[in-house]
Regions:
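Surface-exposed, beta-sheet-biased, low-hydrophobicity segments with strongly acidic/polar composition
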Residues: 3-297
Length: 297
């Protein structure tokens, strides 16, 4: 009886060690998957650029280069694209409408216009665990949380006191051009259910849906794009916001936010298809008047 008891204890210890080793290996493998995770690109298209003409002048209206989709089959919406050129380490944002945004300094809300000149791409630093970052949609800028349209902290996103919203799942951000039928059934009483959690790679993924937000006499459309910035740092929420209905958006009259775009995108249709090339032209600013190196981003 004594020998049998010892064998049982030994078997239990071996089994416990086996389980511990399996858990350890599984944990290490999961950690490796998380650390080595590579975010998916929003498009698999690749692009190429070439000189539009053999020489340039000092006219500040020169067409500088053409850009085309070199490979890939995605048709890209201008409301989700940003195109800029760099010359002599200076960045020049380009747009269809001739307006762009001024770089915002010392703010947790980074706002810029996309290539269509009407949609705002916004990145919110929601990294603080002790306080919320507020944004006013009329100005597209950071505000105190007392005056916010929305507020952000980590994954927690709340509407403001004067904001209501509905969720649209049957139209994309680009397709949504008017207020849809439905009820504005979301308010500031609870946080937005805007993401899914992928446990396998420990990632926050925005749901494929568009928010229609009504505040005062303006209605907006909004889509969350990412929980991560371009450096893949978490708690930096990226979203697209555009006017949908109502009074004109005050943000477009703010000279500290809106400026004339130094370059124009020409030859564009409603979207950028693989068969279409575009031209980048100077917009009253002499970007290049002699041989120069141009980078496209």
């Amino acid at each position: 009886m004594l020998i049998l008891s010892i064998n049982r204890k030994t078997d239990f210890r071996v089994f416990a060690i086996f389980i511990a080793v399996v858990l350890l290996i599984g944990g290490l493998l999961w950690a490796w998957v998380v650390v080595s995770y590579t975010p998916d690109y929003t498009t698999e298209n690749t692009f190429s650029g070439s000189d539009y003409q053999s020489s340039v002048s000092t006219s500040a209206e020169d067409s500088l280069l053409t850009i085309e989709i070199d490979s890939g089959e995605d048709t890209l919406g201008w409301d989700q694209l940003s195109i800029s050129i760099q010359v002599d380490n200076q960045d020049f944002p380009c747009s269809l409408t001739g307006i762009s945004t001024v770089q915002q300094e010392d703010s947790k809300v980074n706002t810029r216009l996309t290539a269509d000149g009407t949609t705002f791409a916004i990145e919110v630093d929601a990294s603080s665990e002790d306080s919320f970052t507020g944004i006013n949609l009329q100005t597209m800028k950071q505000v105190d949380v007392e005056n916010h349209s929305m507020k952000f902290s980590k994954t927690d996103i709340f509407l403001g006191n004067d904001s209501v919203a509905m969720i649209v799942t049957n139209q994309s951000f680009s397709e949504l051009q008017s207020i849809p039928n439905g009820t504005f059934d979301l308010d500031d009483s609870e946080r937005l259910d805007w993401y899914d959690y992928d446990f396998s790679v420990h990632r926050i993924n925005p749901k494929d849906q568009v928010y229609v937000i009504q505040e005062s006499n303006i209605t907006y459309k909004l889509q969350f794009i990412s929980y991560y910035n371009d450096a893949d740092e978490s708690r930096h929420i990226q979203m697209l916001v555009a006017w949908l209905n109502g009074s004109p958006l005050p943000a477009f009259d703010d000279p500290t936010l809106i400026a004339e775009s130094p370059c124009i995108i020409e030859g564009a249709d409603d979207s950028w298809s693989p068969s279409q090339s575009i031209t980048i032209r100077e917009n009253g600013i002499d970007i290049c008047n002699q041989a120069c190196s141009v980078e496209i981003s």
